[in-house]
């Protein structure tokens, strides 16, 4: 009898451990996610800054295995620089987002280089303007906790940065005027587990 009880206890612990170690899927909170950008204007005279607020997707995190994935869908029509005329130009010009032809951008990557239980990079591919290129995100901050306002959920938040060359994606407007094609990105996301 004791051996059966011990075996059952061991099985219970194994199942519980497996459950704790299982990958957890977090849905992007669209109200707390955006991609910020900073781009050159006239070869270093000034900077264009803005955000793209239409970001959704999911993060799958397995802290035990130190692994996970990120999938983001980005709506370039939500670009906001604080200037309506510039926003319209960015949305419509064939050498910028051209949202009529390319209504979404996507980023798919793998969480990597975990330190103290948290990833420090995402190694993935960005598809934008019909072109796919490898882009690595450097994670500056990544934290998870019980949601402070929704007791049946957990929440993770992350800040990351990357640099791209927009010419790599066929977005070359301004090059003939001396614009640098480099763009710095600042990504902020929060993601929550689905309601239980």
Model region roles, listed by residue range:
Residues 7-17:
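Bacterial N-terminal signal peptides
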């Amino acid at each position: 009898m004791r051996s059966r009880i011990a075996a059952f206890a061991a099985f219970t612990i194994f199942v519980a451990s497996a459950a704790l170690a299982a990958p957890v899927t977090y849905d992007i909170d669209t109200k707390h996610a955006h991609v910020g950008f900073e781009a050159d204007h006239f070869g270093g005279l000034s900077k264009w800054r803005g955000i793209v607020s239409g970001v959704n997707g999911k993060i799958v995190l397995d802290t035990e295995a130190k692994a996970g994935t990120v999938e983001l869908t980005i709506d370039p029509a939500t670009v906001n620089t604080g200037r309506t005329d510039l926003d319209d130009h960015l949305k419509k010009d064939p050498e910028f987002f051209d949202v009529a032809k390319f209504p979404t951008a996507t980023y798919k990557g793998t969480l990597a280089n975990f330190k103290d239980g948290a990833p420090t990079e995402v190694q993935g591919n960005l598809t934008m303007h019909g072109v796919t290129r490898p882009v690595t995100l450097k994670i500056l901050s990544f934290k998870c906790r019980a949601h402070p306002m929704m007791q049946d959920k957990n929440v993770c938040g992350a800040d990351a940065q990357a640099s791209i060359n927009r010419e790599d994606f066929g977005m070359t407007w301004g090059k003939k005027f001396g614009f640098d094609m480099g763009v710095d990105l600042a990504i902020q996301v929060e993601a929550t587990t689905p309601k239980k």
